[in-house]
Amino acid sequence: MSLRVGLDLDGSLESLGNSMTDLADALDRTGECELVRFRSRTSASADNETHLALRALWSPLWRRSLGRSINGLLPRVDVVHVAGLATPPTREIPLIVSVDDLRPLRGETHTHLRITQLRRAVERGATLVASSRSASHEVISVLGVARSRVVVVPPAVPRVDETRDGADLVVNITGVDELFIALAPQLIAFAEDHGSRVVALASTSAGQKIRSNGLAITTRARRDARDALANARVVIHLSDGARFPSFAIAALSAGVPTLARATEINRELLEGAAALVTDDGQVRDTLEEVWSNGSRRSIMVAAGRSRAVDFAPDTAARAYIALYREVVRGWTA
C-alpha cells in the first residue's frame, strides 16, 4: 500500500520561493508516496490542494497545538507534515513538525507560545525536525525534550538559475541589523572602489534603519531575493544563525562566491564551500580575496555547486520519504 502523506504548504520561510511546494513537487517525482496538499493558515489556491472546512475557525487553535484533529479534515493519510506556525493535533496518526526558525526559542525573541505549542505536540507523540545538527541541539535544550523526538533533515532549497556576469555586492541580512549598519561604510567604500554597488536584502524594519542612516545602499525586499541573486558577483550572508542559510546555499547553487559569518550552523553546513569569517574585522580583506582572485573564485564556484546538491529539493524529498516511513513504522509498531 502506498504511503499517503498530508503536507502543509503554508510552512515555508523562504524568500526564494515556497520550499514546501518545492518539496511537494519533489516528493511527487519520487513516485513513492501519495500527497495530500493543504494549507493550514490560508485558503487552498490550486486544484491539487485540499480545502479545509472551517479552517479560519481552527487555525488560531492550531497555533497552540489545540483544536480539531487535522486528519479529520483530510482524506485518509498515514502521516501529516507541517512546517509553519500551525501544529494541529492528529488522531491515530503521527505528526511531523519541521522547526526551521529558532528565533522564538531564543533570548530576547523567546516566545512562550511557540515553546508551549511544540512541547504539547511532542507530548502527543509528534516528531520534530531540525534543519541541522546544531539546530537540533538547541531545540532539545530549550524544549527539554528527549533526543529521540528530534531528527535532522535539511529543508529543500528552491532551485535558482546560474548567475552570469553579476556585478553587485549582495548582502542578505537576517537578524543582525545593527551589525550590518556598522559594516556598511566599509562595504560601500569597497563597492565604490570596484565600480559596484551594495544591494541589501532586508526586512521592512532593517530597510527603514538603512534609509534612516542615509546609507548609499540599494535595499530590496526579501521577495526580490531571486532577482538580486541574478545580479550578484559576491554574496555576503549576515545572519544570527537562527535560521537555515537557504539564501547562502542558493547563491552557491547559482555559482556566486559567498562569504558568511562562522556561526555554528554555517560551520556545519557551509565550511569548505563558502568563505567563513570568525571576526567581523576580517570582512574587508576576505571580500577583496573573494571578489578579485580568479583562481579562488573558480574553486569556490565548483565547491559551492557541489555542496548545494546536498540541499536540492530531490535530495530533501528522499530524506523525507525515509523519515515518513520510519515514523509510520514506529507509530504502528
Residue ranges and their predicted role:
Residues M1-A333:
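Carbohydrate transferase catalytic cores enriched for Leloir-type hexosyltransferases
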